[in-house]
């Protein structure tokens, strides 16, 4: 019986879409309440003053102001526009 053997399937050749993680607003940039500052997996950065954290570890602004990063404690803060910390 002259049958053609079926082609085997390929097990590789897939990839997931990128998740677009990272810093969205950098130090010194102005933000309004609700703006996403960082998208991350886990707590690479921690929320500081004027900042909240979502259940997927997204860091977002709670107040209008200016973003600044504290590298020592790896914290992200938002200083309200009229405060001294913003300068």
Curated annotation (Swiss-Prot):
GO terms for cellular component: cytosolic large ribosomal subunit. GO terms for biological process: translation. Keywords: Ribonucleoprotein, Ribosomal protein. Residues 1-22 are annotated as: Disordered. InterPro entries: Ribosomal_bL27, Ribosomal_bL27_CS. It holds the Pfam family Ribosomal_L27. The keyword Ribosomal protein applies. One of its GO terms (molecular function) is structural constituent of ribosome. The keyword Ribosomal protein applies. Belongs to the bacterial ribosomal protein bL27 family. This is Large ribosomal subunit protein bL27. The lineage of its organism: Bacteria, Pseudomonadati, Verrucomicrobiota, Verrucomicrobiia, Verrucomicrobiales.
